[in-house]
């Protein structure tokens, strides 16, 4: 068992598992409320690598496949449940699939990137996009593996207790998790520092991938990857106050472990 004394002051999985390239990847959910699928699929991809022999398994678990085919997960582009995403991976499996416009994996993402609360060349995001159709075949015609042979699975799915230390041990031992928090109107314009909600109304829940933790000027934080592309926030990531369930960030942490054939 770890005591708080044994836990490092800061932890970044990109330094502990440098071979796992997915840890550096920031996705773009586009004009679709699919954050729940991205938080899950990106952490699943990280864990597929972290738990593989010599970190050799470099795959992107497909958010597209999860978003379009997990009917028990909620409402597709209108929101979903992180815990259900992990149990779907365990029960049904998910194929591979990378970013929009790539030939990466069986089912790459089909919703195009857009600007999330920042000015740029991609055009502003419009919420409430249509959920893509579920297909049990590889949409990427240049991919040579059959759908059923491409499926990756979780061996189990679980919730992490709402406890700072338990979450830290989970991140350090098994890799990034999915989490969720309440977004207030003072969050979307975040650029740097440790986010703490001060003012503004609640805009809704948002699921993300928790990477690690640290301290900035004495303030403890979680290091989190968002799915709003690299030009949002701090190169696509943000820091949020750690240790007081700020905006509910510690209350909905879910994860799972990969299964290898």
Identify what each model region corresponds to:
Residues 1-261:
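Catalytic-core signature of thiol
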């Amino acid at each position: 068992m770890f005591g708080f004394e044994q836990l490092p002051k800061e932890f970044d999985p990109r330094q502990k598992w440098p071979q796992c390239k997915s840890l550096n990847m920031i996705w773009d959910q586009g004009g679709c409320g699919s954050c729940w699928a991205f938080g899950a699929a990106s952490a699943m991809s990280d864990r597929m690598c972290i738990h593989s022999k010599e970190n050799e398994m470099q795959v992107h678990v497909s958010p597209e496949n999860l978003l379009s085919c997990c009917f028990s997960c909620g409402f597709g582009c209108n929101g979903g449940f992180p815990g259900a995403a992990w149990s779907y991976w365990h029960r049904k499996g998910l194929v591979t699939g990378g970013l929009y416009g790539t030939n990466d994996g069986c089912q790459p993402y089909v919703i195009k990137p857009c600007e999330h609360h920042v000015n740029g060349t991609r055009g502003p995001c419009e919420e409430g996009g249509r959920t893509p159709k579920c297909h049990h075949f590889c949409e990427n015609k240049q991919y040579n593996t059959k759908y059923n042979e491409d499926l990756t699975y979780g061996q189990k799915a679980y919730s992490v207790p709402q406890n700072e230390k338990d979450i830290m041990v989970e991140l350090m031992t098994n890799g990034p998790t999915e989490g969720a928090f309440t977004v207030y109107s003072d969050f979307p314009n975040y650029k740097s520092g440790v986010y703490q909600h001060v003012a503004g109304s609640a805009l809704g829940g948002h699921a993300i991938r928790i990477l690690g933790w640290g301290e900035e000027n004495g303030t403890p934080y979680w290091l989190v990857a968002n799915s709003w592309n690299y030009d949002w926030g701090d190169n696509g990531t943000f820091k949020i106050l750690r240790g007081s369930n700020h905006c509910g960030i510690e209350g909905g942490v879910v994860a799972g472990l990969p299964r290898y054939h």
